[in-house]
Amino acid sequence: MPKVPVYNMEGAQVGEIELKDEIFGAPVNKAVLYEVSLMYLANQRRGTHDTKTRGEVSGGGRKPWRQKGTGRARHGSIRSPLWRKGGIVFGPHPRDYSYSVPKKVRRAALKSALSDKVNENNLIVVDSLTFAAPKTKEMIRVLNNLKVNGKTLIVTAGYDEIVEKSARNIPGVSVMTAPSLNALSLLNHDKLIMTRDAVLKVEEVF
């Protein structure tokens, strides 16, 4: 079982925690990470793109000139795809891009991402994150104490409004609950900060 140090909010080590091998010590499967990340990104797409066909472009109801006798090519509408401002052939139309992969695969990707954070020493466990009131300045102080910079994901056991509000104005810092943790969020951040309770919650849920 991998062991990682546990820090307090002042950045001092106050102990160690043993992590479950099957979650934090799993082999890193890049193929699964790619497949699941692609799914999450596809599911975020709105799919509202649209183009007008020749039947949807305004105008073009009248034949531009008579069929024969002018010496010009024959045309039936000024909204033909051949014309400037004409309709679009086989253009994009609104569609749903979302799809799903099996839960077992999603969990394998999450375990791979968590294990990668441990392998790269990018997982920081804190005994707790408690603030008297929402203060961005206090959260910045804690991050500085932990020597954390760059894109950082903070994971709490459950929803914590004070932690959420304290971190939301810091660029590159996000807050999630342990049950909603996913592989894409982990891959999108360089550092992972988890409370001790969040680690236990992840081991319980996943």
UniProtKB/Swiss-Prot annotation:
**Which key words tag this protein in UniProt?**
Ribonucleoprotein, Ribosomal protein, RNA-binding, rRNA-binding
Q: List this protein's GO terms for biological process.
A: translation
Q: Which GO terms describe its molecular function?
A: rRNA binding; structural constituent of ribosome
Instruction: Indicate the quaternary assembly.
Output: Part of the 50S ribosomal subunit.
Give the highest taxon in the source lineage. Answer: Bacteria
Among Pfam families, the record links this protein to:
Ribosomal_L4
Which cysteine pairs are joined by S-S bonds?
none
Q: Where is this region: Disordered?
A: 47-77
Report biased composition (Basic residues) as residue ranges: 63-77
Where is it found, in Gene Ontology cellular component terms? Answer: ribonucleoprotein complex; ribosome
| Role played | One of the primary rRNA binding proteins, this protein initially binds near the 5'-end of the 23S rRNA. It is important during the early stages of 50S assembly. It makes multiple contacts with different domains of the 23S rRNA in the assembled 50S subunit and ribosome. Forms part of the polypeptide exit tunnel.
Q: Which InterPro entries match?
A: Ribosomal_uL4, Ribosomal_uL4-like, Ribosomal_uL4_dom_sf
Give me the gene this protein comes from: rplD
Identification of the protein by name: Large ribosomal subunit protein uL4
Q: Describe the family membership recorded for this protein in Swiss-Prot or TrEMBL.
A: Belongs to the universal ribosomal protein uL4 family.
